Amino acid sequence: MIPITLTVRPSESRRWLAVIRQHFRRFEFTRLDDTESLMWMPRVGTVLVTDGLNEIRLQALASDNTKTELIMVELSNEISAAVPEIVPGSRLRLQWTFPRCIPAHLRS
């Protein structure tokens, strides 16, 4: 399994994080604690959402490189649908990482 992390930070105002949170409410959520939830997204699967004051972190698992690319496209599309940008990076900064460890909440 390939762990994928997308960290979303605002370039301007933190209000864009609230817009993303609102957009994600259309998906099925299971609240884990004050800052973490599991979200089910079609074509992606389970996503661990960690909600911070200045960022939102989305973590998912891919079975192979093709699925990794699909997850990256789907998450990017959802962020773009929530916060359309005329110039990429003008409102949000997206940072992709591929950690070595699988988050505990995504292990089965």
Language model features with spans:
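Structural preference for solvent-exposed beta-strand-turn elements
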Residues: D34, R93-S108
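Regulatory modules associated with amino-acid/nitrogen control
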Residues: F27, V73-E74, R107
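Intrinsic-disorder/low-complexity, polar/charged segments enriched in Ser/Thr/Lys/Arg/Asp/Glu/Gln
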Residues: M1-T5, E55-R57
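C-terminal structural segments of small proteins and small subunits
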Residues: A62-R100
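Short, intrinsically disordered low-complexity segments
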Residues: D33-N65
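Short Lys/Arg-enriched alpha/beta "domain-start" segment
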Residues: P3-F24
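Residue-level recognition of well-ordered beta-strand positions that form the cores
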Residues: T7-R9, Q59-L61, T97
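Short secondary-structure junctions
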Residues: R25-L32
